[in-house]
């Protein structure tokens, strides 16, 4: 940046490792004095709080802003390297095309994971022998979550995600966001836009046609330059359904998000021969010839695609800017009127009503059988659904300040604020729809430009039934099918169906909320902390570290629930600080409750392995946020035994445990002599022969193990009378249900909870969980007599809350969590990951309750 008057360096914040995260602004020198004005024009158009005449004027005065990034996944090395080449060309070339781009476009060039690049490059260059260089790093390439850093862009847990979202949705509001990735589908060079169905039903159709336009510019340029191998549409697995990725969350903000996945590596690479990819089709119009593929060629493709997008922005700048406004304006209009989103379930409702009231006519010729009923269904059936007021979208949501876990609701609101959502706060008590709300409640109206994101965070996703052919296997979503954040976090939000107003003040865009704690009430005996509030555990951990004794009630008494924390008056100072910091409202106690038991911090071991586990990393981050002390435990330490000397509780979250059928747990295994000594303790895998006996011994001696997801296979290795509930009998033999009968990709389901169990203190009788073909258990008839009891289960044939659940009727009475007495110790097994991606705040307590002794 110091060497070019076309480039300005900015830091957008610190990473999780404390590095500055860089953003380069690239444009013509003459544009820099007006940069703040162009930025403000983009923000005004994006928020759409101006008239159409103003929008047209600003669209002609402004300059389109294009975001180009790379390096998010550090092992995908093309992404970071193309940034360097693109920077060089834009900063140094003087051809007519480059100069025109610089004159007409504001380019934001961003490295989105500098920590990861440092980790990966240092590791790759470490061996002097070039033939031994590799990318098999011993740790995750983002401090906590590795590859899942591209699953964090509506929650914004990680610092890098927050930095990026604040730039995209609060500061700059680019019209196009281009996110470089690897690797392309086998037999191709690169996958890009447009993408396959389904696309999400809540965003504006101009997003889809905008993707078509940008995609056409990209593929046309590659073809003009004789660069084959661009896969699109159903030529790749990528869709526009899911929210949460760096290039998908922009769709919900009226921005055109571009993903490409390209091949290439510094090590020798070749395009493989895939016969089906040799045939030109709409998904791959210009097939590439298989054979050796130099890394430099991938960089050239990437720069060409960058230039294609920038040229598109030059030629269609005013259109991009005006459409940005138009999508926002239409969102505001939809939020101010009765609006029905066209979900698949509503189309199915129309068909069901029609079929139930109309005598079907058999197709009387081949044409009608093929094309269907050309005359359609009478319009009255449309009105039966799309004039039904119960099926309207809400006009807004109210998060009452008197809900049990309001601090978690504030965290939810901060996730929205980081994404540029407009939030209001009530300055006094008010009434809406006959219900009274206290001062300090928060309001999120849908009459705002980023309405699609608001709807997506509060309302269920309705993924279509998507199969390869009728009766065939499912087409797997690229990531989740449903994710409604309000459900995952367990917040209480009232859906308001009519227009409303009140004593509301707007929160400044992007300004995060601080929890509002209360002063401690007068009490000479002590205080209670509510176990329903997640941050009560944070306060308890602060108290325990301050050497203050803490107790838990064992039964409910009046307004004090079972599992409440009792803090003696000696802890007043620390508790007062915690209440202010975390937004807590401790209540006064008259004295120590009868039967209350003292709790102490457990010595916690969190399992991980060489290369890093993302679910373990998320759990590591969560426990740090809530102030739990812990140590990481690796396979060799487990195999070495004597676990009880160091740990009271062991956590196994997600992969790593050998499967129920035996074998080895997850984890890549380099040769010991090929890695530095400081990583040797991380080597090894859990095995049935060595690891399971040590875990069993730990349990039998009084230890506690908590497992979630795939790690629940431990129950099988221990010989517990627990089996897979999702099976059928075929020819007298038990087998797992096939995908045409049962398939539930990442979706939110509702389970019943045993609130009397101590591991469930603070939970309600129902809880929403993130479920992704997760383990579901069946307890044998003798299980109860052996000290095994269910903690949570599916109570209905239709537990789906958000997403896609084909064959969900099979889930009824399936157990989602259980506890088992093993000798003097206890095993907890949770089929769903109760810590999922740091989003599932509604089930964090199921982990936290097990972390004391």
Question: Model-predicted segments: where are they?
Answer:
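Intrinsic-disorder/low-complexity accessory segments
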Residues: 1-105, 145, 151-152, 157-159, ...
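Structured alpha-helical segments in the cores of large, soluble enzyme domains
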Residues: 54-56, 128-139, 164, 176-184, ...
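Mobile, glycine- and charge-enriched loop segments
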Residues: 102, 107-109, 113-158
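Short, solvent-exposed turn/loop segments enriched in Gly/Ser/Thr/Pro and often Arg
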Residues: 109-114, 124, 179-187, 711
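Feature marks short, surface-exposed loop/turn motifs that line or immediately flank catalytic pockets
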Residues: 115-116, 184-186, 266, 658
């Amino acid at each position: 940046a110091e060497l070019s008057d076309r480039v300005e360096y900015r830091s957008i914040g610190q990473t999780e490792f404390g590095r500055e995260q860089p953003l380069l602004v690239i444009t013509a020198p003459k544009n820099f004095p007006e940069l703040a004005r162009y930025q403000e024009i983009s923000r005004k158009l994006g928020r759409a709080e101006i008239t159409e005449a103003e929008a047209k004027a600003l669209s002609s005065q402004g300059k389109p802003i294009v975001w180009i990034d790379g390096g998010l996944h550090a092992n995908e090395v093309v992404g970071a390297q193309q940034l360097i080449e693109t920077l060089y060309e834009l900063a140094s070339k003087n051809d007519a095309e480059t100069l025109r781009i610089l004159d007409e476009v504001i380019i934001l060039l961003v490295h989105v994971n500098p920590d990861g690049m440092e980790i990966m490059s240092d590791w790759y260059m470490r061996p002097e022998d070039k033939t031994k260089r590799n990318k098999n790093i011993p740790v995750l390439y983002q401090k906590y979550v590795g590859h899942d850093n591209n699953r964090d862009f509506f929650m914004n847990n990680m610092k890098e995600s927050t930095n990026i979202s604040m730039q995209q949705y609060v500061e700059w509001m680019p019209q196009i966001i281009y996110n470089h990735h690897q690797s392309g589908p086998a037999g191709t060079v690169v996958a890009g836009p447009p993408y396959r169905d389904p696309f999400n039903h809540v965003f504006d159709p101009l997003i889809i046609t905008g993707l078509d336009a940008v995609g056409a510019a990209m593929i046309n340029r590659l073809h003009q330059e004789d660069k084959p191998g661009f896969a699109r549409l159903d030529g790749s697995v990528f869709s526009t359904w899911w929210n949460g990725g760096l290039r998908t969350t922009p769709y919900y903000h009226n921005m055109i998000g571009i993903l490409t996945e390209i091949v290439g590596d510094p090590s020798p690479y070749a395009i493989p021969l895939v016969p089906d990819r040799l045939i030109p089709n709409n998904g791959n119009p210009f097939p590439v010839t298989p054979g050796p593929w130099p890394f430099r060629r991938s960089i050239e493709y990437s720069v060409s695609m960058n230039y294609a997008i920038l040229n598109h922005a030059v030629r269609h700048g005013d259109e991009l800017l005006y459409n940005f406004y138009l999508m926002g304006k239409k969102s505001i209009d939809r939020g101010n009127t009765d609006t029905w989103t066209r979900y698949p379930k509503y189309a199915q409702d129309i068909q069901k009503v029609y079929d139930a009231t109309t005598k079907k006519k058999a197709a009387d010729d081949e044409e009608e059988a093929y094309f269907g009923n050309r005359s359609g269904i009478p319009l009255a059936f449309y009105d039966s659904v799309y004039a039904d007021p119960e099926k309207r979208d809400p006009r807004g949501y109210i998060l009452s300040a008197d809900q049990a876990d309001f601090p978690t609701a504030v965290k939810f609101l901060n996730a929205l604020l980081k994404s540029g959502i407009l939030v209001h706060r009530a300055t006094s008590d008010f009434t809406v729809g006959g219900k009274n709300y206290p001062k300090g409640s928060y309001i999120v109206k849908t009459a705002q430009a980023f309405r699609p994101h608001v709807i997506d965070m509060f309302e269920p996703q309705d993924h279509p039934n998507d199969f390869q052919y009728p009766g065939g296997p499912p087409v797997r979503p690229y990531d989740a099918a449903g994710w409604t954040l309000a459900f995952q976090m367990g917040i209480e939000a009232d859906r308001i169906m009519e227009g409303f107003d009140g004593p509301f003040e707007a929160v400044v865009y992007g300004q995060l909320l601080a929890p509002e704690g209360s002063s401690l009430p007068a009490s000479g005996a002590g205080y209670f902390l509510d176990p329903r509030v997640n941050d009560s555990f944070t306060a308890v951990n602060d108290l325990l570290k301050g050497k203050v004794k803490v107790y838990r009630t064992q039964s409910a008494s009046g307004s004090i629930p079972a599992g409440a924390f009792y803090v003696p008056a000696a802890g007043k100072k620390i508790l007062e600080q915690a209440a202010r910091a975390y937004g807590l409202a401790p209540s006064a106690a008259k004295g120590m409750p009868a039967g209350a038991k003292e709790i102490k911090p457990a010595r916690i071991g969190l399992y991980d392995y060489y290369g890093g586990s993302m679910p373990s990393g998320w759990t590591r981050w969560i426990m740090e946020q809530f102030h739990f002390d812990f140590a990481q435990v690796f396979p060799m330490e487990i195999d070495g035994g004597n676990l009880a000397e160091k740990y009271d509780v062991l956590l196994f979250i997600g992969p790593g445990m050998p499967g129920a059928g035996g074998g080895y747990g997850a984890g890549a295994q380099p040769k010991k002599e090929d890695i530095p000594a400081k990583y040797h303790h991380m080597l090894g895998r859990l095995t049935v022969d060595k690891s399971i006996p040590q875990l069993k011994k730990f349990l039998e001696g009084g230890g506690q193990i908590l497992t979630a997801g795939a790690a629940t296979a431990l129950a099988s290795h221990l010989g517990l009378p627990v089996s897979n509930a999702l099976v059928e009998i075929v020819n007298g033999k038990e087998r797992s249900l096939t995908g045409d009968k049962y398939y539930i990709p990442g979706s939110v389901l509702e389970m019943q909870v045993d609130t009397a169990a101590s591991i469930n203190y603070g939970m309600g009788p129902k809880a929403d969980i993130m479920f992704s073909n997760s383990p579901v258990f069946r307890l044998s008839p003798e299980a109860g007599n052996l000290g095994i009891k269910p903690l949570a289960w599916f109570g209905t044939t239709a537990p789906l809350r958000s997403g896609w659940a084909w064959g969900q009727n099979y889930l009824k009475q399936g157990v989602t969590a259980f506890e088992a007495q093993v000798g003097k110790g206890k095993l907890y097994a949770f089929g769903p990951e109760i810590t999922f991606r740091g989003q599932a705040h509604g089930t964090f307590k199921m982990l936290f309750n097990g972390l004391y002794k």
